[in-house]
Amino acid sequence: MADVSIEKLASDIGTTVDRLVGQFKDAGISKSAGEQVNEDEKQKLLDHLSKQHGSAAEPTRMTLKRKTTSTLSVGKSKEVKVEVRKKRTYVKRSDIEEQQRQAEEEAKRLEEEARLKREAEEKAAAEAKKAAEEKARKAQEAKKAAEEERVRRAEQAKKEAEARKKDEPELTEAEKAEAEAARQEEERLRKAQEEEAQKKLEEDAKKAADEARKLAEENERRWKEEEERRKKAEAEEVHLHSNRYAQEAEDEEDMQVERSSRRRRKSKKNAGEHLKQGFNKPAAPVERVVKLGATITVGELASKLAIKSNEVIKTMMKMGEMATINQVLDQDTAVLVIEEMGHKYELVNDNALEDELLADGTDGEKTSRAPVVTIMGHVDHGKTSLLDYIRRAKVADGEAGGITQHIGAYKVQTDNGEITFLDTPGHAAFTAMRARGATATDIVILVVAADDGVMPQTKEAVQHARAAGVPLIVAVNKMDKETADPDRVKTELSQLEVISEEWGGEHQFCNVSAKTGMGVDELLEAIVLQSELLDLQAVAEGPGRGIVIESRLDKGRGPVASVLVQEGQLRAGDILLCGEEYGRVRAMRDENGKDMKLAGPSTPVEVLGLSGVPVAGEDAAVVKDERKAREVAAKRHQKKRELKLARQQKAKLENMFANMESGDVSELNIVLKADVQGSVEAISESLIKLSTSEVKVNIVGSGVGGITETDATLAAASGAIVLGFNVRADATARRVLEAEEIDLRYYSVIYNLIDEVKAAMSGMLAPEFKQEIIGLAEVRDVFKSPKLGAIAGCMVTEGNVKRSNPIRVLRDNVVIYEGELESLRRFKDDVQDVRNGMECGIGVKNYNDVKVGDQIEVFEIVEVKREI
């Protein structure tokens, strides 16, 4: 071929000119764009690229597949084709030898490195040992030289003393004593110096000997490790190159030798013990003691009884209870099953860990504490203004700008003592406390505007206070207005059974004005008087206990909980357990935002450091063990989850019977709202009259107007259903009702409302079932079907015959079989039912002994509910 240009060659092979020029350069050929390329240069480039990419190397492994086909005669005229496939892999011998050679060289290299390393370590150890010996020898020589120097100095001093004694005249007694004392002092100092030098030499020698010993021990340990590693590698190498079956045989032989040597070591005295039967037949039935908590599954019960689960299920079926292996049994059912199976039980407390953790109670001397007061009322009745006046007059005296309340709670100092106020907007925390049976609130102040009278939310506040069982003090506000009418307020509240002391009741009424401050001191005195009547006391020492007023998630500080301490003391650094959350108190702040180190009873504080945001209304307690606190919090979370799953259908009208059975609902709680007061009174009276000895209707709350968030929280706290008569729920209330899964029903006719509540109460009673005959057919002939067996040709004499209904086969008016109608045909068509006077073919499921003259009775099971 003729020479081609660089551009043409690059275009033919599909690459760029620059890359091709670079490849020529790598091959040792200098080319540039525009030059020509001859055949020799092409061949050189091709050889270079082949070597570079490895294509010039010879194959090291080759696999050949062969297939041969032959014919095998089977019998006289039958032949079978046999195909034999063979696969052979050939490996280049030089490669194997090269690999073995490389492995041997690598092993030699590693062995040489190990030898050199070992020699270096031995040499270092020898040098260290020699250095230590040399150091010890020098120390010994120094010691000997010091001893000789000491002896020489002593001799010299003795000679000098004798010379001085000869030359000097006779000394007096005082001079002799002074000279003797000087000599003794000099001798003492010399001995001290010699002892110090001797001690230093001994320490240096001992230190050198210790270093040499440690180095020798370290080298000896490393040599042993190297030797063990080398032996292990040699053993592994032997096994790697040995046959697998030979290795297994060798291991088996070693095990047999070990077993035989073990048998030889055993004494003949104990040989007879192994020949005895290991199982002894029980002389009496095994009686087990099962520890029972509140609930237990069938599988867990079987495991504790050491029997199979189907045995427990059989026993329950004999007792008339159907169950599965994962079904949860309550404590009473489990007790009956255990007693039926002949075992014993022991009731245990599921909250043992929690009780143990909280056992360190505040046992001590009780002292009086400040009352906890909650102020409730309509937002337009001056509640906020009254709070602001109390805070400005009693808390922020002398402080510019007043005080910003951080935690919804604060203390007021009066002449008669302290008062703790709780600000619970929306009454959410108050309702949660009442639902948990808490006693955080001691007194409720009801604020009512003198010019506006009792409003619907005022009635709701009265219902909340009455449900919580706390005393009520009425503050009639806005008395500075000309239209103020306190007598009207007393009259309207008397309809709610809130009677003033002036009218012979038990509730205190105070006329106040948040604008002018009139009556505020009298209100505070009334609170103090009421608290003295209640005789409020608490233990001031010991671990603190309280309740969570409110909680939130602060962006900069994390979970923040407002806690009202009820007993004991809460300190910074304590481990606090609040419901499902726990943590160490990192910081505490009071209502002014100032840091606190200690909080006593009736003191509200803001706590930082919890693991999460606790629920408002949860109990808070100081514990000692953080690990146990974490376990209790996790267990509470699990228990809450199980309870939530168990009460998915709680407060549903259709499931009242199930709730009654489980003991969750002992009465039908209702929150009733209507458009006018007359309807509320009429419906309440009618519903209460429906109560019987078995089922009781309890009107938890009632009022006029739309269904609000307060009604929803009240229903959630008391497990009630919400009934609305010509009213509707607002968006906030609907969100709460959906979140708590509370049943909400609207009515416009009073009779429909009463009938449905009556039906719900009837649903609490056990239903009855009865069988109702719907058709009768007489067998006229019997046919055989290959698919269905015996088919009865029948004439329907009474009622209708329906497909897939339960049936009975009667012979001489005696029931001989009870089953299900499987096939129903008229002529050749499948039909769903056949009326009276028509012929049909009936196939009875799993029964073929049908005879002419039999009667087939078709029936259905009807549930008959008990009604009140």
From Swiss-Prot:
Instruction: State its location(s).
Output: Cytoplasm
Name the positions where GTP binds.
377-384, 423-427, 477-480
- A GO molecular function held by the record: guanosine tetraphosphate binding
Q: Quick one: where's region G4?
A: 477-480
Q: Where is the composition biased (Basic and acidic residues)?
A: 92-240
What keywords appear on the UniProt entry? Cytoplasm, GTP-binding, Initiation factor, Nucleotide-binding, Protein biosynthesis
Q: Which SUPFAM superfamilies match?
A: Initiation factor IF2/eIF5b, domain 3, P-loop containing nucleoside triphosphate hydrolases, Putative DNA-binding domain, Translation proteins
- Span list, region G2: 402-406
Chief location of this protein within or outside the cell? cytoplasm
Region Disordered, residue ranges: 49-72, 92-276
Question: Where does the tr-type G domain lie?
Answer: 368-537
Among the entry's GO cellular component annotations, what is one? cytosol
Name the segments for region: G1. Answer: 377-384
Stretch list, region G5? 513-515
Q: Which InterPro entries match?
A: DNA-bd_dom_put_sf, EF-G-like_DII, EFTu-like_2, IF2_assoc_dom_bac, IF2_II, IF2_N, P-loop_NTPase, Small_GTP-bd
Q: Where is this region: G3?
A: 423-426
What family classification does the UniProt entry report for this protein? Answer: Belongs to the TRAFAC class translation factor GTPase superfamily. Classic translation factor GTPase family. IF-2 subfamily.
Query: What is known about what this protein does?
Result: One of the essential components for the initiation of protein synthesis. Protects formylmethionyl-tRNA from spontaneous hydrolysis and promotes its binding to the 30S ribosomal subunits. Also involved in the hydrolysis of GTP during the formation of the 70S ribosomal complex.
The protein in question is named Translation initiation factor IF-2
